[in-house]
Amino acid sequence: MKKIKKAIIPAAGLGTRFLPATKAMPKEMLPILDKPTIQYIVEEAARAGIEDIIIVTGRHKRAIEDHFDSQKELEMVLKEKGKSELLEKVQYSTELANIFYVRQKEQKGLGHAISSARQFIGNEPFVVLLGDDIVESEVPAVKQLIDVYEETGHSVIGVQEVPEADTHRYGIIDPLTKNGRQYEVKKFVEKPAQGTAPSNLAIMGRYVLTPEIFDYLKTQKEGAGNEIQLTDAIERMNNDNQVYAYDFEGERYDVGEKLGFVKTTIEYALKDDSMREELTRFIKELGL
């Protein structure tokens, strides 16, 4: 069984929920405190043992490449001014993994974005991490899925429970059997209509996929939103070769929409020793 050393991070979306801020800045570069959201995703992959990451980008995404590249002029200035802590942070972001880029030329959905990286992945299993979800956990969420893959040899999809009222916003699994936090899956349903979801176990932006998925994506017809949906291709693959789901442990932060982004920023700030006390005082002063 091949070890998983490669990851795909899709980052080609237009970020329309954050306009006009994302007109000139990639959504993935919006910061949670002092780090862009995409760095949290790359850090999770690196902690899970991933060595090579391909980021699928689109137009106006050059800032992502610049962020993970070295900037010698800035490093020199920080060094001359004795700002060693900032220098270390800047250098750290360039040393997380080997990062490559491919452009998704058309906005045709998540499945199409994954297909764009086929040449990079080759005939190896790989992980996918979506940038809308930051997960805080002792064992990285995607590493939990890798562990299941290493036991089963099959693709594994990360899930967590959501309120039934929200199931229409997610891909949902119809579980067949359960073993602890691990499920065999009868069916995958992409964004079921309100009240029709087979469970409240939602796909949460973390995947381990075998390379066979590319064959299914190649022939996948357009689905929800007239896009090539990854969930639809996984469902077809599951009909031929069992796909597992795993209810990963960890606190998930939804940074793909404005309210979730604000909540995440506040929660991370409250965890920061340098601002917790003053921020707590400020919140109390608001008298909410």
From Swiss-Prot:
One of the Pfam families matching this protein, by short name: NTP_transferase
Similarity field: Belongs to the UDPGP type 2 family.
Coiled-coil intervals, chain numbering: none
Reaction(s) catalysed (UniProt annotation): alpha-D-glucose 1-phosphate + UTP + H(+) = UDP-alpha-D-glucose + diphosphate
Catalytic EC class: transferase
Protein known as: UTP--glucose-1-phosphate uridylyltransferase
Domain of life: Bacteria
Gene3D superfamilies: Spore Coat Polysaccharide Biosynthesis Protein SpsA, Chain A (3.90.550.10)
GO molecular function list: UTP:glucose-1-phosphate uridylyltransferase activity
Gene Ontology biological-process annotations: enterobacterial common antigen biosynthetic process; UDP-alpha-D-glucose metabolic process
Function: Catalyzes the formation of UDP-glucose from glucose-1-phosphate and UTP. This is an intermediate step in the biosynthesis of diglucosyl-diacylglycerol (Glc2-DAG), i.e. the predominant glycolipid found in the S.aureus membrane, which is also used as a membrane anchor for lipoteichoic acid (LTA).
Enzyme Commission number, as recorded: 2.7.7.9
Keywords tagged on the record: Carbohydrate metabolism, Nucleotidyltransferase, Transferase
Keyword Acetylation: no
Keyword Nucleotidyltransferase assigned: yes
Pathway the protein acts in: Glycolipid metabolism; diglucosyl-diacylglycerol biosynthesis
